[in-house]
From Swiss-Prot:
Leader sequence residues: none
Top-rank lineage group of the source organism: Eukaryota
Gene Ontology biological process terms in this record: pollen exine formation; regulation of shoot apical meristem development; sialic acid transport; UDP-N-acetylgalactosamine transmembrane transport; UDP-N-acetylglucosamine transmembrane transport
Protein name (record): UDP-N-acetylglucosamine transporter ROCK1
Topology in the lipid bilayer: Multi-pass membrane protein
Keyword match Phosphoprotein: no
Transmembrane segments: 14-34, 43-63, 110-130, 136-156, 172-192, 204-224, 242-262, 271-291
Record's keyword terms, sorted: Endoplasmic reticulum, Membrane, Sugar transport, Transmembrane, Transmembrane helix, Transport
Amino acid sequence: MATANGAKSPSSMGPKVLFYSILLTLQYGAQPLISKRCIRKDVIVTSSVLTCEIVKVICALILMARNGSLKGLAKEWTLMGSLTASGLPAAIYALQNSLLQISYRSLDSLTFSILNQTKIFFTAFFTFIILRQKQSILQIGALCLLIMAAVLLSVGEGSNKDSSGINADQKLFYGIIPVLAASVLSGLASSLCQWASQVKKHSSYLMTVEMSIVGSLCLLVSTLKSPDGEAIKKYGFFHGWTALTLVPVISNALGGILVGLVTSHAGGVRKGFVIVSALLVTALLQFAFEGKPPSSYCLVALPLVMSSISMYQKYPYIDKKKKKV
């Protein structure tokens, strides 16, 4: 099934896409536990993030060499095409992350979690605007169930942060508005990535390379005035690192490549389903390895996630005009 502008509508998932989705769910779900066990507290965050981006670029280039797309890259690649397909989404994601950091300081975990999950709706909205991919009534219902499940999971795992000392104006301008803007930007960036891969036929591996380079450059510029930059100058780039630190760094890099593949083949909306499902995986792994039982929120969210995935998969939008023809 294709939309009017030539983009493929991911109404059904093939074996390859299902495999990518399962891998991403497991990786995203296991990442918090792996990071907690393998990264020491004195490791400078910027050093792990930059190393992750470098590993991501190396892995993507290896995969491109393996599938033969690296050979024709010199002839096909253009700066304008790269900036349009990858530069813009990378810049949007960087701004989104900054807005989330601002808002989290001014909102309690419940309000933050609820507002942050609206990105699923905005992804569906921008997918319709940019790619003309419509959702059926039941799919919209499935998105509502998914957001409910995401909020329950986020609240169950969230901290008991109290923002009672923050006045209403500060909460609005430094909390609510930034997180809503971040949700809009998240939906826009995800849809742009899907557009670049499905309409412009931009390789997901190439997008990973380009976005990692742009993101790394933005991060390097930010270190000029950030505490992490001062810490790197004082203690060195690999301060606090051990051999185990590479495990979560490599895992996170592979997860970034999987995000690109899932977005490219299944779409940004389905990526949202994968990310929420991964929260359940995290809860189960915490129970298995740390003895921490799933919260009541998690137990309530489990059937909601399963129902939403089933509904979204079984009842795609069908164009009545095309059906008659």
